[in-house]
């Protein structure tokens, strides 16, 4: 076998007949499979042991030679080689076809490769191959045209006319093979190149296509006649097995049926040829052989598929590769693994952040080999077999050994669907009773897990390296930040939030208000004995709290609550005391108003202070982010555990419950609804009188009911009691929002009908009063639509992620600095007046290209090529800078990837990115993972305001990434200049916009109803939109440069996500956009050997040009091409990656003709062939590293030993 990690590339070509013979171990002559009595393979059949190898290890067919000592001997009785049975997975056979047969991929694919090579239409080819027409192969002296087609009757007439033997015409694949042999590639290519200089239109397109195929044959050394088969390979029998089922019946792979058909027809044809049967019978048999081979290669590609029992189409070789169940996606990219288990998850509130609970029974099975090794090592039993019995019996002694074996041996937990890298994390196992895995509550958000019956899978990393990587890179305590936006992903939720909210509440006039404590212990004692309440405002001496006080705050009394003293006790000492939930308090310290000189009246001072709001979920998130910024992961994960414990403890003590009495009643609800009914009545009257249109009436009615609901909501908020449990849950961010509250206490409001339109009849009741039957029925529409939308959205979002991963999987950080001289100019992204993404956020974590100077003083705020921190970014924005040039993925010069400086910070760690990080995959996951949160609907703007519906949500993201023509397209100007006039033309219901510039004048026709973005006298630049709507990116690319298209796409994606409240780092979108504009189309080849019209990678294009320019030739010119992600994935340089994505047969057909080489640069292609992936520690620069001595330590000759030393060593030994 080839060593997988040794070879550099993999090539695919057409197989010549000699190549097929060299693979084969013998010819399959009979259609038999196995003997039904002996169940042994038949001689010369499809499972023959002579050809394919023995069915049992080290044993020939007749049983003369058994055992490994006869290895390599060929039995003289039965002719079978004595070897391992697994050779039946790799040895091939062949069938000598009695008539040539065309390969359906090359004749039927689009475009037909055979047709292009011969310059014949696929229709004509089909007629010839399936014996419906003759083709002239050699006209000799007759006036017949070479390659002309004639029917049987015409053929006979021509024979009569010109005499037998005056010309050669044949039918079937044989004729095509003869024609293919006649093709002179060099001459044809020269002719086509000449033709291209003058050709236009359809003729030109066809010439470019033909040239492409012929050039592929010429350069790859494949011969066109190999597209017709004379010899058919037979794949190894263990790849098309026959398995005996219970009850003596057999289940066989469909391929055996298909091969059997081919052999039967081939043998019959041989017999007919021997008998010199009439031509028409032989012809029919040849056609049937052709059809049998077609079905074997790709059943159903032409005509009706061959079916098995129950009219089920048989699975051919092509089907074995295609689709989710095909070889690529089922077996090569996603394998099932050993050392894994799965179980229901339960919550583990007592676990540390890096731990998970594993049931004992599961652990003993997962760690069985480790336990067995340890049993033998301890001499409990003598051999592995006995150890295995011990484990299976459940001997008492194994549990202690198991405890030791799993110590410091991390396991991986995975929850499907794995939408981003946080879907698999490593934990240290803790043995527990029961049968459910225990999961730490804080990692639930990353997994999107809950405990309503979710299941999770567990995997054991085996090798030392795998364990080290799991511990260092994947431990759950390390995953504090979300890779999509760099914000903490492990924020406390639900009970934890509620507990800390309750803990930090303040109440005026509670028992013990104004007491002063000398330290925390005293405060806690007073609390336990009932002198004070958690919410009581008290004083405590600042000297007793180890916090960073300012000079003026030392030796004072701090006015706070008992709860806040407890809350601050779990915080790191270096963090300011948290007295109020503000950023100022968090970053700068406690405001001075909370401090009092000792001896002053504290009660008075406390009553003068306003009550602070408690700490909510958002505030806890800010605290965690700040602590992460200061102390990194270890301290943060410890703090999170303390926050969790505190939260659970106090939410239990608070004992908050929800009852129907907790839902308040709005006194004047009836009046508000009555008013709205009257307004609706008036609106309907106006409509009946014809004063307003139906659309306007509908909009007014729905607006009126919305207003009524909002009025009720406002009343609720105004009258809410801060100690009401529902209000507390809502306000703290633990669960629920104002909309839930107003449906419980106000009114449910308007509902969506099944078609997505809002119904005019609102639901006037709330859940406390209960709904009427009709209202209940209405509300089911909305609920059902919600469920179906979610289901559809999940599938759509998953498919989007898959396409994104595929297009960017080979984007890896390959070097430190690419040395590019280009940068990206960034400003805040806005939409009209609305801020989408501020400059500050876009700047953090990026390297500057040029230094940033203060606009007024000219002082350098940030030098060039420096990683911008949050503080720097804030300083830049505060100085009034509005645009900055940064290093960007879009302008990076690294081949097959990105450099560290152009990428910037790794959002998941908060540090500069490392070489080897698979940033493409991370980008794809970051964009795909929130896909399910985006809406599905295309918004209808109520018929009046706009001319078109603007797509939003998930469909818009797909539209952008697939570079489709958008719905509601904006008209853009191709001229830079001034809008001179906008004229309305009533007859055609259009408007004309005139733009005058220095280079000329542009006239644009826009629909009458379109909303204009410009007015007369406005200055517009090239590519600016004249009307509202989305710009078509391909159109923009034709008018502007590549960078402006990339910037536009980036801004558009951000608009969709930010409008739905999802934050994604720019760099992820940049990675994707860059992959969409990687290709150029050659317009003029110059002196290069490129072909006109070829689509190629921009790096390959610059290479070809560099070589020509060095030798003094004319370089080629090309035009950038914007491709959708699906197209870009299929056009990737790796045929393995493309074939495993979509359109498998087309990709492989094309790659084989070109003799493509896959250099295995991406992740997918390496996974497919089982090579270590070139990312992370799999990169070449990290392999085979040797430890090096940094500095040598000088060795001291004499050692002085003191008695203390001796004693201490002794005590160590005795311990």
Curated annotation (Swiss-Prot):
The RNAP catalytic core consists of 2 alpha, 1 beta, 1 beta' and 1 omega subunit. When a sigma factor is associated with the core the holoenzyme is formed, which can initiate transcription. InterPro entries: DNA-dir_RpoC_beta_prime (IPR045867), DNA-dir_RpoC_beta_prime_bact (IPR012754), RNA_pol_asu (IPR000722), RNA_pol_N (IPR006592), RNA_pol_Rpb1_1 (IPR007080), RNA_pol_Rpb1_3 (IPR007066), RNA_pol_Rpb1_3_sf (IPR042102), RNA_pol_Rpb1_4 (IPR007083). GO terms for cellular component: DNA-directed RNA polymerase complex. Zn(2+) 2 binds at residues 818, 892, 899, 902. It is an enzyme of class 2 (transferase). It catalyses: RNA(n) + a ribonucleoside 5'-triphosphate = RNA(n+1) + diphosphate. This is DNA-directed RNA polymerase subunit beta'. NCBIfam families: rpoC_TIGR (TIGR02386). Mg(2+) binds at residues 450, 452, 454. The keyword Mitochondrion does not apply. DNA-dependent RNA polymerase catalyzes the transcription of DNA into RNA using the four ribonucleoside triphosphates as substrates.
């Amino acid at each position: 076998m080839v060593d997988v990690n040794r070879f550099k590339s993999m090539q695919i070509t057409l197989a010549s007949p000699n190549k097929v013979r060299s693979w084969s171990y013998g010819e399959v002559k009979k259609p038999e499979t196995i003997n039904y009595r002996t169940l042994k393979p038949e001689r010369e059949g499809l499972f023959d042991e002579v050809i394919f190898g023995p069915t049992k290890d080290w044993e020939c067919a007749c049983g003369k030679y058994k055992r490994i000592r006869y290895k390599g001997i060929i039995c003289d009785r039965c002719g079978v080689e004595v070897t391992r049975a697994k050779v039946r997975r790799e040895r091939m056979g062949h069938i000598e076809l009695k008539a040539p047969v065309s390969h359906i991929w090359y004749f039927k694919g689009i475009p037909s490769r055979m047709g292009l090579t011969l310059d014949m239409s696929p229709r004509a080819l089909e007629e010839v191959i399936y014996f419906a027409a003759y083709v002239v192969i050699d006209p000799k002296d007759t006036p017949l045209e070479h390659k002309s087609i004639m029917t049987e009757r015409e053929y006979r007439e021509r024979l009569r006319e010109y005499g037998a033997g005056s010309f050669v015409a044949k039918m079937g694949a044989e004729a095509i093979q003869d024609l293919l042999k006649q093709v002179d590639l060099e001459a044809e290519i020269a002719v086509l190149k000449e033709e291209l200089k003058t050709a236009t239109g359809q003729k030109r397109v066809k010439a470019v296509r033909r040239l492409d195929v012929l050039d592929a044959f010429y350069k790859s050394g494949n011969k066109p006649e190999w597209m017709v088969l004379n010899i058919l390979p037979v794949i190894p029998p263990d790849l098309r097995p026959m398995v005996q089922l219970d009850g003596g019946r057999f289940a066989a792979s469909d391929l055996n049926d298909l091969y059997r058909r081919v052999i039967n027809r081939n043998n019959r044809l041989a017999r007919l040829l021997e008998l010199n049967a009439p031509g028409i019978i032989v012809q029919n048999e040849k056609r049937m052989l052709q059809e049998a081979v077609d079905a074997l290669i790709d059943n159903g590609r032409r005509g009706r598929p061959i079916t098995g029992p129950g009219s089920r189409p048989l699975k051919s070789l092509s089907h074995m590769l295609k689709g989710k169940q095909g070889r690529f996606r089922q077996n090569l990219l996603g394998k099932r693994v050993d050392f894994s288990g799965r179980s229901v998850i339960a919550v583990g509130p007592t676990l540390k952040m890096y731990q998970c609970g594993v049931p004992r029974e599961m652990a003993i099975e997962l760690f069985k080999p480790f336990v067995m090794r340890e049993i033998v090592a301890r001499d409990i039993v003598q051999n592995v077999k006995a150890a295995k019995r011990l484990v299976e019996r459940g001997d008492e002694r194994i549990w202690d050994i198991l405890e030791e074996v799993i110590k410091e041996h991390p396991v991986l937990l995975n929850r499907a669907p794995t939408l981003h890298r946080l879907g698999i994390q490593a934990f240290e196992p803790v043995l527990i009773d029961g049968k459910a895995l225990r999961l730490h509550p804080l990692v639930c958000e990353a997994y999107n897990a809950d405990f309503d019956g979710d299941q999770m899978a567990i995997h054991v990393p085996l090798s030392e390296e795998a364990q080290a990587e799991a511990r260092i890179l994947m431990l759950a305590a390390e995953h504090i930040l979300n890779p999509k936006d760099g914000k903490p992903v492990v924020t406390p939720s639900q009970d934890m939030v509620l507990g800390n909210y309750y803990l930090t509440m303040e109440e005026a006039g509670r028992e013990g208000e104004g007491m002063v404590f000398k330290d925390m212990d005293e405060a806690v004692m007073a609390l336990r004995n009932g002198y004070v309440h958690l919410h009581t405002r008290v004083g405590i001496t600042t000297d007793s709290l180890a916090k960073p006080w300012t000079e003026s705050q030392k030796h004072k009394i701090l006015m706070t609550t008992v709860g806040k003293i407890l809350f601050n006790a779990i915080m790191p000492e270096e963090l300011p005391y948290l007295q109020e939930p503000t950023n100022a308090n968090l970053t700068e310290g406690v405001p001075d108003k909370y401090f009092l000189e000792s001896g002053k009246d504290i009660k008075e001072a406390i009553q003068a202070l306003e009550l602070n709001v408690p700490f909510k979920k958002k505030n806890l998130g800010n605290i965690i982010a700040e602590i992460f910024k200061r102390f990194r992961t270890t301290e943060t994960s410890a703090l999170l555990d303390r926050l969790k414990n505190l939260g659970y403890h106090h939410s239990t003590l608070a004992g908050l419950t929800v009852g129907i009495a907790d839902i308040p009643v709005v006194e004047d609800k009836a009046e508000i609804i009555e008013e709205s009914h009257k307004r609706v009545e008036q609106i309907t009257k106006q409509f009946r009188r014809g004063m307003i249109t139906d659309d306007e009436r509908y909009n007014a009615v729905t607006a009126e009911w919305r207003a009524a609901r909002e009025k009720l909501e406002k009343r609720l908020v105004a009258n809410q009691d801060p100690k009401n449990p529902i209000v507390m849950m809502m306000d703290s961010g633990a669960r629920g929002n104002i909309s839930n509250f107003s449906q419980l206490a106000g009114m449910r409001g308007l509902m969506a009908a099944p078609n997505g339109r809002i119904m005019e009849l609102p639901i006037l009741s709330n859940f406390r009063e209960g709904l009427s039957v009709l209202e209940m029925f209405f509300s089911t529409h909305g609920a059902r639509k919600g469920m179906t939308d979610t289901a559809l959205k999940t599938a759509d979002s998953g498919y989007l992620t898959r396409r994104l991963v595929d297009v960017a999987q080979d984007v890896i950080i390959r070097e430190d600095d690419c040395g590019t001289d280009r940068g990206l100019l960034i400003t805040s992204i806005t939409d009209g007046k609305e801020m989408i993404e501020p400059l500050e956020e876009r700047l953090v974590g990026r390297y500057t290209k040029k230094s940033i100077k203060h606009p007024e003083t000219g002082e350098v705020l940030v030098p060039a090529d420096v990683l911008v921190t949050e503080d720097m970014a804030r300083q830049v924005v505060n100085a009034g800078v509005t645009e900055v040039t940064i290093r960007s993925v879009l302008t990076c010069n690294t081949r097959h990837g990105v450099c560290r400086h152009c990428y910037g910070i790794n959002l998941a760690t908060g540090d500069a990115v490392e070489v080897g990080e698979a940033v493409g995959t991370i980008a794809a996951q970051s964009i795909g993972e929130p896909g399910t949160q985006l809406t599905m609907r295309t918004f209808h703007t109520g018929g009046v305001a706009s001319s078109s519906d603007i797509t939003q949500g998930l469909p818009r993201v797909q539209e952008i990434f697939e570079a489709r023509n958008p719905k509601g397209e904006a008209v853009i100007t191709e001229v830079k200049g001034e809008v001179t006039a906008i004229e309305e033309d009533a007859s055609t219901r259009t408007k004309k916009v005139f733009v005058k510039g220095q280079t000329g004048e542009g006239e644009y026709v826009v629909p009458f109803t379109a909303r204009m973005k410009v007015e007369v006298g406005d200055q517009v630049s090239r590519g600016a939109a004249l009307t509202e709507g989305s710009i078509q990116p391909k159109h923009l690319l034709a008018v502007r440069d590549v960078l402006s298209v990339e910037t536009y796409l980036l801004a558009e994606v951000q608009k969709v996500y930010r409008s739905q409240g999802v934050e994604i780092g720019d760099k992820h979108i940049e990675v994707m956009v860059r992959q969409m504009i990687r290709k150029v189309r050659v317009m003029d080849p110059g002196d290069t050997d490129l072909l006109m019209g070829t689509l190629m990678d921009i790096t390959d294009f610059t290479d070809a040009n560099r070589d020509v320019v060095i030798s003094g030739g004319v370089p080629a010119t090309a035009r950038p091409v914007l491709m959708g992600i699906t197209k870009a994935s299929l056009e990737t340089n790796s045929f393995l990656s493309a074939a495993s994505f979509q359109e498998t047969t087309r990709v492989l057909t094309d790659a084989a003709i070109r003799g493509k080489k896959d250099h295995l640069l991406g992740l997918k292609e390496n996974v497919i062939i089982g090579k270590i992936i070139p990312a992370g520690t799999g990169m070449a620069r990290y392999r085979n590293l040797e430890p090096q001595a940094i500095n040598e330590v000088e060795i001291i000759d004499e050692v002085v030993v003191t008695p203390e030393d001796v004693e201490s060593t002794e005590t160590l030994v005795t311990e």
